[in-house]
Amino acid sequence: MELLSYEKLMIGDELNKDSVKVRIVLCSNSKEGVGIMADEKSPGHQNFLSRLDAKGHVGEAYVLLEGNGEVTVFVGIGNVEEDILLVKNNARKAGASAYKCVSQFKNMEMSLTSEYMAREVVSGIMLASYKYRFLHKEKDEPSKKIAINSQSHAVKKAVVVGNAQNFARFLGDTPANLMNPTLFVEYATKYLQDKKNVTFEVFDKSFMERKSMNLLLGVSQGSAQEPKLLVARYRGKSGDAVDIALVGKGVCFDSGGISLKPSARMHRMKGDMLGAASVLSVFGLAADMGIKINMNLVIPLVENLPSGTATKPGDVHVGMNGKSVEINNTDAEGRLILADALVYAQEANPTYIVDVATLTGAMMIALGDAFIGYFTADDDLSKIIHQSGIDANDPVWRMPLSQLYLPSMKSNVADLKNAVEGGHGGSATAAIFLSEFVGKEFKWAHFDIAGVMDSNNNKGVYGDGATGCGVPVLIEMIEKLSTIIN
């Protein structure tokens, strides 16, 4: 099957002489009125806004066609004295609003008139530019070219992170019949094949059987699609010691299995591989950025479907580390494939292990789409993750990883059961289940991105479909870890 051309989603800094030049001017709101946030202010611009009675509210936008044919977009950022996370989010919304004002142009060279919140504004431009138009009969905007004209490190970083985030969104938005385990591997191969210092291999069902990855195999056995295990290595510095292993949940479609989900919104479960999409995107981005770190990537890929061969509620499978698990809910499958993948990742003896998954609906209830929930027993790692979330404008919230939850995961016929009765503490019990497959000597963190896989409160930025949230905080975390390790 021919792969879709995701490359057309990418934005760069290659300028085109025929491009429309678009300048973005941020406008703040305060008691004194609208304020222009520009390094060089024009009296004419202030008069323009005054005539329009502009307030600088978030999302407020005005377009001015200058005499030289250039376009200036004035966009509101609101009150800049608010909480820093709110201001950053408003700046991202401003970038998205600015893009939408000029999105009719096929060729644009965009620039900012101020460095204030430049990373966040450009992030908004990047995310708002994403449009999944690969399968329509009429393909709109086939030749649109956008360039961000800036020498700023913050802006350049926002562009490459935005491209990686949009790649993760593409993977998550592609229908499951076009993104099964085999096709995911083909996209991953295309994405990784030319990256410097990267090697990768793909293992099949027979390998998993030899490694006794029976939890992973148990999830996949209801589908005609064979499971895959994608393993990649990036060596950004000398030596072969592994600094960090990234593990991503790759359930390419999750029907719930025999514990079938309700049909309403089941179509969203094509995105149940966004953990895999996120770590793949971040891994490739780290290689592109040349981060001085040695990193492994482990992605288990399956479909979770009901059939005559599917795992049944009450079945018991023995994981790669020898622990037996009673499958009392086949819709709690992500933790099963992660368990074996985490055990496999430990064979390389990494210093840090980070797994990412759209794991629990309970996380949606707990944090909504405002924060990513994460779990770790390592306070130093937690501080790095928390600050990375702030710096990357991809906020996170630490959740309890406590042995107090473990008794609820005990089974009378196996070492563990895979889901708690009644769903109480669903995210925390899932995390403590995973901890049973990670050695205490490893610095481990678990990201549950289920709540942010799509967005209700930021549709002006993300639109419908996948958000790619998790990519910005992960690459920021990896950069910070590289400075500590080196």
From Swiss-Prot:
Required co-factors: Zn(2+)
EC assignment: 3.4.11.1, 3.4.11.5
Keyword Cytoplasm appears in the UniProt entry: yes
Catalytic EC class: hydrolase
Principal location class: cytoplasm
SUPFAM superfamilies in alphabetical order: Macro domain-like, Zn-dependent exopeptidases
GO biological process, one term: proteolysis
InterPro entries xref list: Leucine_aapep/pepB, Macro_dom-like, Peptidase_M17_C, Peptidase_M17_leu_NH2_pept, Peptidase_M17_N
Entries under Pfam families matching the protein: Peptidase_M17, Peptidase_M17_N
Binding residue positions for Zn(2+) 1: D254, D331, E333
GO molecular function ontology, one term from the record: manganese ion binding
Active site: K261, R335
Compartments in which it is found: Cytoplasm
Entry keywords, A to Z: Aminopeptidase, Cytoplasm, Hydrolase, Metal-binding, Protease, Zinc
Catalytic activity: Release of an N-terminal amino acid, Xaa-|-Yaa-, in which Xaa is preferably Leu, but may be other amino acids including Pro although not Arg or Lys, and Yaa may be Pro. Amino acid amides and methyl esters are also readily hydrolyzed, but rates on arylamides are exceedingly low; Release of N-terminal proline from a peptide
Cofactor binding annotation: Binds 2 Zn(2+) ions per subunit.
GO CC terms, sorted: cytoplasm
Keyword Metal-binding: yes
Binding of Zn(2+) 2, residues: K249, D254, D272, E333
Complex formation: Homohexamer.
Task performed by this protein: Presumably involved in the processing and regular turnover of intracellular proteins. Catalyzes the removal of unsubstituted N-terminal amino acids from various peptides.
Recorded family membership: Belongs to the peptidase M17 family.
The protein, known as: Cytosol aminopeptidase
